[in-house]
């Protein structure tokens, strides 16, 4: 529970801080001042490429190099070129998506992010239910032909980036009482969900 449940809070936290410090100022400027966003995307792209080169010998030694061009781009754009590097393409792609959608309409951004997150959740934590429905399983098989996970910048990242943008606005912040009660209650529900989805073998990836 602590390793595969509580430990997984880290990436959503990092995504929310990105929304808070990078995307919120872009929105506050009326979507005109792109400098901070462009700098963030450039720095993370360079970090991702550097990490990819660093882990290349390990991938080569382990026999995990992509076997064709499709697998290469799948790893580079969605899955990450090494297991834990999926965060980089997720935050880069997620930022681009949210920036485009939010500039058009914050409402459109929230609608997309909510639907995408539910689709992603069904393809990960609750895939054990989805695979029992042939039509839905076929749809997800199509998704998994492009990305091995729904835990990526299309499905997973946008909702947390938008949440970070939302709490950057003082009017959206919770009271101390709500935080004091909301945190422990939400952690309890998180642990219950993690325990049950593992116990019932619903998770596609732990």
Spell out what each predicted region is.
Residues 1-206:
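Alpha-helical transmembrane segments and their immediate juxtamembrane cytosolic regions
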